[in-house]
Amino acid sequence: MSAADEAAYGIRAFTERFYTVVLGRYPDAGGFDGWVAGLTAGTLSGGDLASGFFLSPEYTGKNKSDSAFLDDCYQAYFGRAADAGGKQGWLDALAQGMTRTEVLDGFSGSQEFIALAESYGIRPFSGYGSARVAREADGIPIPVFPIPLFMLLAGLLGWLGLSRFRLGS
């Protein structure tokens, strides 16, 4: 199998996982092909795909509990069950007002998801790497943070109990 075939297979497998885990069904041809084309072209990131599935009327209409939502996140994003401590941290954050969209952003920015997405040749989230590439092209070294700085700040504020100062909505 050529490298291009392997990359195409990986993107298809990545997309199919979100259909089966998040929506609980096999993909429809039109939707599946659209997601795969966007990921292949780089116009969509893995985080875009994940948000599209988790925020879709099909998923939100299931009215899943926060616990079930997090179980789905761990399976879809990481391909594994939630660890007790990590899941409890997310449950606490949701109980204190964090939105599910913010949770999805946190999963998309995690080292585990970044590594997984990159292994499929997929950009983990919108804007990932773009500033670094542009600055390095100009010969300007920049620091690289393993997690986007705004996500670290949002997590720190939540940890400090200052959730009323949330970033975004």
Q: What label would you give each PLM region?
A:
Residues 1-137:
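Substrate/cofactor-recognition hotspot
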Residues 35, 90, 157, 166-169:
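Amphipathic, positively biased hydrophobic alpha-helical segments used for protein targeting
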Residues 100, 137-141, 159-162:
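Low-complexity, intrinsically disordered short peptide segments enriched in small/polar/basic residues
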Residues 134-151:
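Short, threonine-centered small-residue motifs that mark membrane-proximal processing/anchoring sites
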